[in-house]
A protein has these predicted regions:
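Bacterial Sec-dependent N-terminal signal peptides
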Residues: 1-42, 64, 74, 98, ...
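N-terminal leader/linker segments that initiate helical-solenoid repeat arrays
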Residues: 17-73, 80-89, 96, 100, ...
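Hydrophobic positions within repeat-based interaction scaffolds
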Residues: 27, 31-33, 48, 85-88, ...
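Conserved alpha-helical positions within TPR/SEL1-like repeat arrays
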Residues: 39-40, 72-80, 111-126, 151-166, ...
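Flexible helix-coil transition and linker loops at the boundaries of alpha-helical arrays
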Residues: 57-66, 97-110, 144-150, 184-191, ...
Length: 413
């Protein structure tokens, strides 16, 4: 199939690019647009094959913008192959070209630069470098100011929203999701951007504990699920599983995590399967099925590789293994896992809350009720703090939404 498409596109290139230079360039633009339309969904699922096709086509192009447009998409393929150094290197070539030729075809340069910085932001997110990701994504949005069309702007706003969600800044997260929704409405684009926006808003409201609103957005997104890539379906299934985990509907959570697990079978990066296997392991602990829990936790640890040694992640996984040990009444192992020394500024307060609850359970099982009470009080204190923070985030998100809605109202007037 790949060789047929290369031959077919080569034929189109010969037909479309013969004649005067302007006709040749128009033909190249049509060729590249056709190529990207054909391989849009294959970049994630067959990235190496797509690199071969794009590279073969680039070698015959005369227009530099078309050349670097394909190269920009190749950088995404390296990301999907989990070759992050190569993804950054190729992405850097595209950005350098755009910045050196800023006065050329300004509109096309802006669109390409916006796409390149959007890719770079996603790469930084993958590495957990959120400050660098935010900087790149804001550069992407700035690059598209005045560009026509701005079809990638909703995607940039979704990525910005996701960055702020990871930072725990839910007000700015909600702001950018709603900006993405406004842009999608104004551009009149297809279902895919709406799916990402609705899924993201569902995750946001799950984090805020507003489960009715979260469920509403999940249902909106689910109606569009068939039109999306495997990665987008994975994100939806894993997020839906987390929703049911938070509402304590563990059988439903298990169903959705298993769906996510099946989707990751075709992914070249082990990270996604590692995440969902961690979720499956924790869910089986809550369902009091220790053998299944151990299977998935052990496999998650294997799949995470070097990431397992990062303090924040190790603290989280040690906590899950401690829960498993408590379930099996292996109190010495549970105590050893819960007694590790970590720098608290590197640890999510939610995980500290869970570990204090585990310590309370441990000492209750040991008959040391005084210590069990002390750890219960510490857990309650963190829980109160987290609840207050959630309320503040909810109020801030409502305030942002209100200000956006009233701004639109004034424009309509």
């Amino acid at each position: 199939m790949a060789y047929y498409i290369i031959w077919r596109l080569s034929w189109l290139w010969l037909v479309g690019c013969s004649g005067r230079p302007s006709e040749r360039m128009d033909g190249e633009i049509r060729l590249v647009d056709s190529l990207l339309a054909i391989y849009k969904d294959s970049m994630a699922e067959s990235p190496r094959q797509v690199i071969e096709v794009f590279s073969a086509t680039r070698s015959r192009l005369h227009d530099s913008l078309d050349y670097y447009n394909l190269l920009s998409h190749e950088s995404r393929c390296y990301y999907y192959l989990n070759q992050m150094d190569e993804a950054f290197r190729v992405n850097g070539q595209v950005i350098t070209y755009c910045e050196r030729n800023a006065l050329a075809d300004r509109n096309r340069i802006r669109i390409l630069l916006g796409d390149a910085y959007n890719n770079r932001g996603v790469f930084w997110q993958e590495l957990g470098q959120r400050d660098s990701a935010l900087l790149s994504l804001k550069k992407a949005a700035d690059a598209l100011k005045g560009a026509i069309p701005r079809t990638s702007l909703p995607s940039i706003y979704v990525n910005l929203a996701d960055c702020y969600m990871q930072e725990g800044d839910y007000s700015w997260c909600g702001y950018y999701y709603r900006q993405a929704l406004l842009q999608a409405d104004s551009l009149g684009i297809g279902d895919r951007d709406y799916f990402a926006i609705y899924s993201g808003l569902a995750k946001l409201y799950t984090e805020l504990g507003n489960y009715p609103e979260a469920d509403d957005y999940f249902r909106k997104a689910e109606q569009l699920r068939k039109s999306c890539t495997a990665y987008e379906r994975y994100f939806f299934a894993n997020t839906r599983g987390n929703y049911y985990y938070n509402t304590k509907e563990y059988d439903h959570a298990l169903e959705w995590f298993r769906r996510a697990d099946r989707i990751t079978d075709a992914f070249p990066q082990p990270l996604y399967k590692a995440i969902v296997h961690g979720n499956l392991g924790e869910t089986f602990i809550l369902l009091r099925q220790p053998d299944s829990a151990r299977f998935y936790l052990d496999d998650a640890r294997r799949l995470f590789g070097k990431a397992y040694d990062q303090p924040a992640f190790r603290y989280y996984m040690d906590g899950l293994y401690a829960s498993l040990a408590l379930l099996e009444n292996d109190l010495p192992l549970a105590e050893r896992l819960l007694s590790g020394v970590y720098e608290q500024e590197q640890i999510n307060p939610l995980y500290t809350y869970y570990n204090n609850r585990r310590m309370a359970e441990l000492y209750e099982k040991k008959g040391n009720y005084r210590k069990a009470f002390d750890f219960s009080r510490m857990a309650e204190h963190i829980d109160d703090s987290l609840r207050n923070e959630k309320v503040r985030n909810s109020l801030a998100e409502i305030d942002f939404r209100y200000r956006q809605d009233t701004t639109l109202l004034r424009k309509d007037m």
